[in-house]
Amino acid sequence: KYLVNQYWDPRSFHHPFYGIMCTEYSAAEEQLVGEPWVIYKGTDDRFTEGPHLYKLNGYYYLFVAQGGTVYAHKERAARAKSLYEEFETQPGGPFLTTLDAPYHPIQKAGHGSLVDTPDGEWYFTHLMGRPLHRSQESSIDPRGWCPLGRETGIQKLIWDEDGWPHIAGGHNGLLEVDAPLNVKEHKWEPDCPVKDDFDGDR
C-alpha cells in the first residue's frame, strides 16, 4: 500500500507545487515506512495536486489535478509499470477540462477519482462549477460566478485500446450522463458512533 500526496517546495523562486510524492504504508504496523520519493512532477500547467493512484491491468495509473480550481482547472492521467520508474503523461492533453470551452455549462472541471460498477462500467467523479453570468459582463472573462461553489460532477469513462482513459463525449464532459446499468443501491451500515461527547481519555 502507498500514500501519495502533493510535495510542497518552500524554496524561493521555485514553483511551490513541486510534484507528487509517494510513501510506502505498512498495514501491519499502521504507519508509513521508508523514505518518500517524487514519482511525478506534472506538466508545464503546474499546480499539480489531488493525486489518486490505481493499479490496473499491469500499470500504476496516477490521476492528478492541474491548474487550480479555477477556469483553467483540468485533470491529467499518467502511468508507469513500476512506482520507481518515470510516469508517462497521457498524450493528447488533459482528459478532462473546460478551459477551451468558455460557453460550456460545466466549468472548472477536474480533481476527481475513478468509480467502477459490478458490470464493468467506469465513471469519473470530479469537482466542477456551474457559473451564472451577469448581462453587463463578458461571458469569456470572467466566465461567470459560481454561487454554489465547488460542486461534484460525474462522467462516463471509457478506455481506449492503448489503455488510456477518456471521457465519453469528449474532454469537456457532458451536462447529463446516463446512469449505470443494473446497479442496485447499497446501503452502508454506520461503523462509527452517531454522537460523541468527547469525554473520554483520548
Where would I find each of the regions flagged by the language model?
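Carbohydrate-active catalytic/glycan-binding domains of CAZyme proteins
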Residues: K1-R202
